[in-house]
Amino acid sequence: MRNSRRRLLAFVCGMVVSAATAFAAAPGADDSGAALWAGDAQRTMQWVMRHGDHGGRPFAIVDKKQARIHVFEPSGALVGATPVLIGLTRGDRDSVSSFVDRTVASLMPTERTTPAGRFDSEPGHNDKGEAIVWFDYDAALAIHRLRPAPAHERRPQRMASSDPAERRITYGCVVVPEAFYDDVIAPTLGRHRGVVYVLPDEGTSDAMSSSAEMALRAP
């Protein structure tokens, strides 16, 4: 899942401009019943559909600045959106290249990042047999349900917070509410291979560069 195309999208996503535009999604799209998107996620969705970059697969956009996920059908229809928990530390690069001889508990705070980029996702299971969606298997990064964690991390309270900064606590995985996983993730990314686009913490631009588009069209 680590390839030059994904790296290119990490760069491309880093150039997506923030915009003031927001609009309401379909009723029931998230916990509030009307998911408002920031411009970054909207522009990325439009770019994905314009170029067919998802290859006719379900896809998700993780907006790290807002600590939210938006999940789409292959047609581009929004299935749902919700606040998420993401990596403790801001950063857009892979902090850990492989978990060979490493454990999650061994990660330093500076290594607990959710990297930006384009990831080919696939359904799978963790070591406890729980259903998850891998988006970077080599780095042990997945989308999964909110699970029990040390009390001092206050994960349920952080998930409920309206402050995106409060929702930075994980080791790099994207953690969603249990009901959202069951109702939105499981029938889409949990059933089929897909694509996960993780938007960056840093970087702005007003358009996708022509060189990036040419590279995406290259064999």
Describe the role of every protein-language-model region.
Residues 8-9:
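N-terminal export leaders
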Residues 14-18, 22:
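Hydrophobic alpha-helical segments of integral membrane proteins
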Residues 35-39, 56-59, 63, 171-175, ...:
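Soluble non-cytosolic domains of exported or imported proteins
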Residues 40-58, 62-154:
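Gly/Pro-biased beta-strand-loop elements
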Residues 112-219:
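Exported/periplasmic cell-wall-interacting domains
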